[in-house]
Amino acid sequence: MSAHDLKLEEIVNAETLRRKLNELADTADESYTSLPMRKVVLQTLKDALASGRANAEDMLMKDGGGTLCAKRLCYLMDTLIDILFEFATTRAYPTRNPSKAENMALVAVGGYGRGGLAQGSDIDLLFLLPYKQTPWGEQVVEYTLYMLWDMGLKVGHSTRNIDECIRLAREDMTIRTALLDARFLTGDKDLFRTLEIRFEEEIVKGTEPEFIQAKLAERDARHRKAGETRYLVEPNVKEGKGGQRDLHTLFWITKYFYRVKTKEELVKLGVLSRAELKLFNKAEDFLWAVRCHMHFATLKAEERLSFDIQPEIAQRLGYTAHPGQNYVERFMKHYFLVAKDVGDLTRIICAALEEQQAKHVPGFNRIFLTFSRRKRKLSDDGAFISENHRINIARPDIFRQDPVNMIRLFHLADRHGLEFHPEAMQSLTRSLKLINADLRENPEANRLFLEILTSPRNPELILRRMNESGVLGKFIPDFGKIVAMMQFNMYHHYTVDEHLLRCIAVLSEIEHGELKTEHPLSNHLITTIKRDRNLLYVTLLLHDIAKGRPEDHSIAGARIARRLCPRFGLTPSETETVEWLVREHLTMSMVAQSRDLNDRKTIIDFADTVQTMERLKLLLILTVCDIKAVGPGIWNGWKGQLLRTLFYETELVLTGGFSELSRAARDKQAREALAERLSDWPKEERDAYLALPYTNYFLTVSLDDQVRHAHFIRDADQQGRALVTMAKPHAFEAVTEITVLAPDHPRLLSVITGACAAAGGNIVDAQIFTTSDGRALDTILISREFDTDDDERRRAERVGKVIEDVLSGKAHLPDMLAKRTKPKKAARAFKVEPRVEINNTLSNKFTVIEVEGLDRPGLLSELTGLISDLSLDIASAHITTFGEKVIDSFYVTDLVGHKISNATRQGNIKRKLLALLGAENGARTNGRSPQAAA
């Protein structure tokens, strides 16, 4: 990279700035250390800093060079520090006859020493002394540091002599690493050179294994802290897996081992090929561009590429939308592919280190846990060997001789439970061009792959290695298209390929009985479908494979499944099942969370879709794996309960156990059952109570809950309380039930949901019933927050008290809602296109209104209030949140209990709900279809 490319003269003109300071000093009447003079010098340097940064940002926007920008900002800082240090030592605190003790070198260390900076990067300085600090030296250091701090810079500093540097580097790996990056800035260069020589001779020599072991352990700890996967959708660009620090670690290791100063020297040594060096430089340049843009855009040292800044960074980098993917998703896919490249480089360099240095460096093998050099053959043709519990290639040409070996490598690793030798993975990565149409259609390769995918051991681990090496995306090109693909929303925590691998991991855990407490039904069902277990693994690999395309990914994915399954060796009937599962993989989740499971038509319609018990079992397990693998905190007991309820109710239909009794007959049976449970009540009181609820109550509420409600209402009547609440935690379902008894009025549910929101209750479901004497019995389910039932009950009782206070007029709801926190900062980056659908076919008794929009505090209260204002009665509400998006379903009738069939009235309802949903939308659209949340 030449000075011409850098255009450093456009960043800062060192001679002009130096001359300006000298002229100011020459014409000054005051002492150079006086406050007025200090202010003038400081302002001059601050102006140069601001101008240089602005120029660097302009140049970044024009040429897009991340490494160029980092070097320009570093040059700017070098220049300012050099001129400031010169002013400090020649003007502020000059020495007439300096002794040797008053020599000093100013050294850049750490990230600054590497020669690249973002705008908010720390400036790490070492004031290097020959001996002990002198009074003159203290004055110079203090003057320099305070000027830098007053310029608004984050400066880390140390003042040490050479002996101290060597001693501390021996004791502290962080200091050793910082000195490894040391770069001379200004002052006594011979002093710095002495430090370099002693560091090489006294610290580096003979400590290579120790250093590498420490750096790799440090990297692993950093990954655990930042997030193990490189596919977290809000990555830390500096510290995350596949980020800048991983590249730094690679260069530290090679620099320490090979005594190189530049990456280019690694090609001469055979560590990297020319193509791999190009990959290293491209990754470094991209990460610098992203990080520099982040610092410029946020005006701070922002290292996390969060949702709220992803759109701006994508725009700054020039990304545009393509069919099926918006500009943010295209940018983030590029980011994750670069992170994957960093992982490839890690494997390549580790392989080179082990191969070229292990024999020559005592103790080196301990780094890679190779306690011996024993080898054994793993295949009849001798192509693969087991070397210290890791699979390796026996010859460099085995992949070229037989490309099926590229799949066989993973098959043998799975069968023998082996890790992968870095040399094998390096050779594999360099042989990816061998994966062509012939290999993809090879029956043996596909047989081996299907056995890997459906392995009874740990298929996710092997598939992950296949993906990291690039083999999986090459062998299944449709999978390659979703590698590193993110979805710009707050619901999905991982890229699409990472999600698919995690789905397979969840299925394997269920199959091994590791999740039987959390998922009892899936744990049982998996034992009954042994013949079809392979189909589940294939489906999970393929169910989201069509994400990022313009059309519905479920339909497009089903077509891909129909094409791929025969290639994998599945029979026509197995292919048909997988195709159906992929097409319907969202259906069970949608029905369970967005429909009234107490409505018989919901169950009958779902049973018509499923048709057989075998498909119902497969779809249930598939749905559990899909939801659980979305990310931490997405799965909860309430979703599990909804899915189990839908499963059991549908099972009754499919096995012929579903009762076809009339509503009147079932109502009569339910009332008789409750009367029997209330047999200890006086007959007159019992009969009066049984006349209170309407038919829908008896057909939808369980008998145990009916009994509990009866005692609840009886106690309220005896106490003369018209308004009362009751709380009941449901630990396994991870929800808490709040029952409200109150005089009925049109906006009651709106007030209750608003009070719930004001009290911090997150509503997931609501059932609304009225009694013949004009009261409402509303049951609200809120997400659980505490581990113990006692704590959760107390919290729910506080929510209930707020509901009572609002309904009784003791508290003013608008004021309470105004105090609630605003939408999360990240949510403001999104726009969810408002959607309202009014459907009369989903229920025999109710009109179903489904709304979709950007979630915000108090939205449910606004929606229910508007629905009430439109003269509609809400029988039940079902609330589903997908990150920033909410999908709410309301089962409603008009005020006389009829469906809403008039088209004009439907149009009016839709317009007003759309207006409400669009009132406070976000800034950008993610362009998702209604089902894309799953």
Swiss-Prot record:
Kindly list the cofactors needed: Mg(2+)
Disulfide pairings: none
Query: Quick one: a GO biological-process term for this protein?
Result: regulation of nitrogen utilization
- GO molecular function (one): [protein-PII] uridylyltransferase activity
Q: Which organism is it from?
A: Brucella abortus (strain 2308)
Similarity remark: Belongs to the GlnD family.
Output the InterPro entries linked to this UniProt entry. ACT-like_dom_sf, ACT_dom, HD/PDEase_dom, HD_domain, NT_sf, PII_UdlTrfase/GS_AdlTrfase, UTase/UR
Quote the EC number: 2.7.7.59, 3.1.4.-
Concerning SUPFAM superfamilies, the annotation shows: ACT-like, Nucleotidyltransferase, Nucleotidyltransferase substrate binding subunit/domain, Poly A polymerase C-terminal region-like
| Domain of life, per lineage | Bacteria
Alphabetically list the UniProt keywords.
Answer: Hydrolase, Magnesium, Multifunctional enzyme, Nucleotidyltransferase, Repeat, Transferase
Q: Which residues form the HD domain?
A: 496-613
Q: Which reaction does it catalyse?
A: [protein-PII]-L-tyrosine + UTP = [protein-PII]-uridylyl-L-tyrosine + diphosphate; [protein-PII]-uridylyl-L-tyrosine + H2O = [protein-PII]-L-tyrosine + UMP + H(+)
Quote the SMART domains the UniProt record gives: HDc
- UniProt feature coiled coil, ranges: none
* Protein name per its UniProtKB record: Bifunctional uridylyltransferase/uridylyl-removing enzyme
Activity regulation as described:
Uridylyltransferase (UTase) activity is inhibited by glutamine, while glutamine activates uridylyl-removing (UR) activity.
Domain comment as written in the entry = Has four distinct domains: an N-terminal nucleotidyltransferase (NT) domain responsible for UTase activity, a central HD domain that encodes UR activity, and two C-terminal ACT domains that seem to have a role in glutamine sensing.
Q: Where is this region: Uridylyltransferase?
A: 1-379
Question: What is this protein's function per UniProt?
Answer: Modifies, by uridylylation and deuridylylation, the PII regulatory proteins (GlnB and homologs), in response to the nitrogen status of the cell that GlnD senses through the glutamine level. Under low glutamine levels, catalyzes the conversion of the PII proteins and UTP to PII-UMP and PPi, while under higher glutamine levels, GlnD hydrolyzes PII-UMP to PII and UMP (deuridylylation). Thus, controls uridylylation state and activity of the PII proteins, and plays an important role in the regulation of nitrogen assimilation and metabolism.
ACT domain mapped to chain residues = 737-818, 848-931
Q: Read off the HAMAP family from this record.
A: PII_uridylyl_transf
